[in-house]
């Protein structure tokens, strides 16, 4: 059994016994999940521009909504999202995102999006060329707002 799953099971068993979550163990499960799963499957891109070009060329992203923005703005928006230094608060939230929302390669062997990437693409897609709205959407989604599942899951994807 993967160590992050073992730790998550321990968190759940502890909760069932005591009614309290072992948050230290949960944080360790998140850390191990990234080390043993996400980072291993992550496809590295040199920068946001390279990532966008690859995902459009390979038919993962719709190009039409991205063409409403210049690449400098898109890269700046990615930097803004990453500047929040977002960390998943629990193993369950991280695994739900990477199992259900993050874009993966068609064969499932590579993870193509991180949380911040999905946020930026969703914001760009919904803003339809309005840079100020895209910026506000990234800020809202990185701090509190979560769009409904179909929107978060499908925005910008082919």
Language model: regions and residue ranges:
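Extended catalytic cores of very large enzyme megasubunits
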Residues: 1-158
